[in-house]
Amino acid sequence: MDRKTFLRTTVAGAAALVAAPGALVSCASPKEKKQPSVPLRLSFQEGVTPGETLAEKLDFMEKLGIVGFEPGGKGLAGRVQEIREALQGRDIQVSAICAGFDGFILAEDPAVKAQFDTSMREIVRAAGELGSTGVIMVPVFNWQNPALPHTLETRDYLCQQMHDLGEFALSCGTTVILEPLNRKEAFYLRLVGDAAAICRDAGSAGVKCMGDFWHMQEETSDYAAFMAAGPYLQHVHIASRGNRVMPGEDGDKDCYTDGFRALKELGYPNYVSFECGCRSDDRAATLTAAVDLLRKQWDEA
């Protein structure tokens, strides 16, 4: 293997080559690039928000100044009109779409892969109709078998598949967003920098990646993860650091300023979306406190 190929396919090479020049400077002197004017755009997944109906959920979000709504992808094509009408006249937009497809992209079984191709494209079309920033996808979970082996050939295959999917997403006015997971959930894609390298090598502006504060804490620092993503960063998930509940419910563990500082330095334009449970019986009060905590830490970052 020559040096160029080695750098292209290693974690170190991915992190080094993905970062834009400005990002590399920021990593060397992280306090010099603060951009406090960058707004914190918070989003809630549909299941996070209290309320019996979609209208009630959105009413609650509006009261807190939440500007993003992240629905699931399952059945999304049949909900486009419902969601459009519910958002009409509100200062809330659809952020990302949380998966919801059948099958998986790295399936060995052609029938399972075909399920992914069909269902994912249906969700991507609906995402485009809703003006979503993209559809989140994981290449393969630990429990999904049989899957293609973790080899250079599989990586090349994934890059080609992502290119095709990214181009389709662009034609629909949206993107596809690779999500790295922690090692307990995924063997294949675990670092934000690795996901960004695949975005780069896929060669399509429709292929992006995301970072999740819950998953990132096991793999690298929040700051380094986001800076490695650079211009490919399209979405962010957030939860408490100990038990994946609401930010603040795990006390002093729930510090996000390191990651927020990176998002500011990057001029990150998209959403930080709640993907978490709730320990408290009073979900509304806990969400309100969580939003206050994140806004405070954003100002401090």
Predicted regions and their residues:
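Histidine-acidic metal/acid-base catalytic patches
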Residues: D2-G22, C27-S43, T53-G65, G131-T133, ...
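Surface-exposed charge patches
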Residues: D59, R84-E85, R125, E167, ...
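Structural motif corresponding to the early beta-alpha repeats
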Residues: V67, P71-G166, R244-M246, Y256, ...
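A cross-domain feature marking catalytic cores of carbohydrate-active enzymes
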Residues: L42-V48, P71-G75, A96-F101, M137-P139, ...
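Anion (oxyanion) recognition and catalysis
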Residues: E62, Q88, G128, L170, ...
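Active-site acidic/histidine proton-transfer and metal-coordination neighborhood
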Residues: T10-P21, K31-P36, L106-K208, A284
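Residues that cap or flank secondary-structure elements
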Residues: V48-P50, K74-G75, Q115, Y157, ...
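Generic anion/oxyanion-binding catalytic loop in active/binding sites
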Residues: E46, P50, L58, I105, ...
